[in-house]
Regions:
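C-terminal substrate-binding/catalytic lobe of Rossmann-fold NAD(P)-dependent oxidoreductases
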Residues: 2, 6-45, 123-239
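Structural detector of well-ordered beta-strand residues that form the stable sheet scaffold
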Residues: 4, 73-75, 99
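Generic hydrophobic/aromatic pocket-lining and core-packing "Φ" positions
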Residues: 17, 60-64
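Short glycine/serine/threonine/alanine-rich loop segments
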Residues: 22, 72, 96
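Short, acidic/turn-prone active-site loops that include or flank metal/cofactor-
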Residues: 30-33, 79-82, 103-104
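N-terminal Rossmann-like NAD(P) cofactor-binding module of classical short-chain dehydrogenase/reductase
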Residues: 51-52
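Short glycine-/small-residue-rich Rossmann-like dinucleotide-binding loops
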Residues: 55-56, 79, 180-182
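Rossmann-fold NAD(P)-binding glycine/threonine-rich loop
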Residues: 63-65, 77-99, 109, 113-117
Length: 239
């Protein structure tokens, strides 16, 4: 598998580089350090099977354009995309295979599936999501917490996302609360609490190191390479 890596000098890029090694045939990084091209123009045309993006969500337009130009698969590992950027991803998937996930962890994909199954099994249960991350994380709730909510909403279309809790007012039956904690150097913890009255269920995933995201990104690249045009995600990889 021949890969081009966007965001090669970033933390995730370096991890992926260490896994794929000789399979990397091209690199791009906005900082230009270590002689790495800063743009697609500086890189030039390089034949590859997959373009893996772990740079920044604002780069997605250039990543997709380059992947289409060389007729390669695109794996988008960045988060925080605007509605316009998500529309670009959707449009590109009509022409090339695109793998896009808000979290590249296979364990999180399993958690989302289990949360969906639990919500279906206990249609009247109260459900709350709790996410914990390090103090340097700038967004809340996490994109992964939104992913979990979206998975639950597939079987509870009436569900309403409620971020945080303050002031007066009872919890409504439709809401699914999301609580965010920022503590020390926590890589990432996500919990789903289901209260069915006579019984309670807690689903929990903890990221021990960020290696899981790099490993998931590589697995995603191998999974989607050679697939027909379309939009793929971690649930597709689970089968």
């Amino acid at each position: 598998m021949r890969c081009i890596l966007w965001g090669a000098n970033g933390a995730m890029g370096k991890l992926i580089d260490s896994i794929l090694k000789d399979e990397i045939v091209g690199r791009v990084s906005i900082d230009g350090e270590n002689g790495v091209p800063r743009t697609a123009g500086e890189l030039g045309r390089v034949e590859a099977d997959v373009v893996i993006d772990f740079s920044h969500h604002t780069a997605v337009s250039g990543v997709l354009e380059y992947a289409e130009e060389i007729r390669a698969t695109a794996v988008i590992g960045t988060t925080g995309h605007t509605p316009e950027e998500k529309a670009m991803i959707q449009a590109a998937s009509q022409r090339i295979p695109v793998f896009y996930s808000g979290n590249m962890s296979l364990g999180i994909a399993v958690l989302c599936r289990l949360a969906k199954q639990a919500a279906a099994a206990f249609p009247q249960a109260d459900i709350e999501i709790v996410e914990v991350h390090h103090t340097r994380k700038v967004d809340a709730p996490s994109g992964t917490a939104h992913m979990i909510f979206d998975a639950i909403r597939q079987v509870r279309p009436q569900a309403v996302e409620h971020c945080g809790r303050a002031g007066e007012g009872k919890r409504t039956a439709e809401e699914i609360g999301i609580s965010s904690l920022r503590l020390g150097n926590v890589v990432g913890i996500h919990e789903v609490h289901i209260d069915a009255g006579s019984q309670r269920l807690t689903l929990r995933h903890e990221a021990v190191t960020r290696d899981m995201l790099a490993e998931g990104g590589v697995e995603a690249a191998r999974f989607v390479a050679g697939k027909p045009a379309g939009l793929y995600n971690m649930q597709d990889m689970l089968g």
